[in-house]
């Protein structure tokens, strides 16, 4: 269950249970019936947010962050397998906001052009890699791209990362 935790002083309880629940959520997408383009209206995409309490997704532990990231990637890989069986032109990607993972999502794009707008022309944060930094296993052939989107009024750096299917020209 997705939940915003405003009580920052409370210790996060039940971490192993929450991680098992997150893994079950990711595995569920292997058999999930995909929404049709008509279901999303004129948006051109369908997304699923990370279903955890914010204090788990934004926890300072490297291990917990890596687990959340890997669950997003596993979800996207399961969705991509489902989307390949459909005849439509669909693309799947993880859209990650760093360092606030709670805002991250897995997105199923129904429009190649809309996916291209997220995909970008280059990897602006290269040679950095979330996959290397966190020991993540990416599906074969998938790409990783990072962009610095920090605004002057923000307190710290904000990065957007896309980990998803390659976009052939």
Q: Which residues make up each language-model segment?
A:
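Short, structured coil/loop segments at alpha-helix boundaries
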Residues: 1-2, 26, 61-62
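Basic, mixed-charge low-complexity alpha-helical segments
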Residues: 5-24
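Acidic, low-complexity, intrinsically disordered interaction modules
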Residues: 34-162
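Short intrinsically disordered terminal tails
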Residues: 1-3, 164-169
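Charged, amphipathic alpha-helical stretches
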Residues: 25-35
């Amino acid at each position: 269950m997705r939940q915003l935790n405003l009580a920052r002083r409370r210790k996060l309880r039940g971490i192993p249970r929450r991680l098992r629940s997150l893994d079950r959520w990711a595995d569920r997408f292997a058999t999930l019936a995909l929404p049709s383009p008509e279901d999303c209206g004129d948006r051109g995409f369908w997304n699923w947010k990370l279903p955890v309490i914010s204090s788990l997704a934004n926890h300072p532990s490297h291990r917990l962050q890596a687990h959340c990231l890997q669950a997003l990637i596993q979800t996207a890989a399961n969705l991509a397998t489902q989307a390949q069986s459909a005849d439509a032109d669909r693309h799947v990607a993880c859209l990650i906001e760093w360092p606030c993972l709670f805002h991250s999502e897995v997105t199923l794009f129904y429009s190649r052009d809309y996916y291209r707008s997220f995909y970008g022309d280059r990897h602006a944060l290269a040679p950095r890699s979330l996959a290397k930094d966190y020991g993540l296993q990416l599906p074969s052939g998938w790409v990783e791209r990072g962009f610095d989107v920090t605004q002057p009024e923000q307190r710290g750096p904000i990065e957007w990362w896309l980990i998803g299917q390659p976009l052939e020209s």
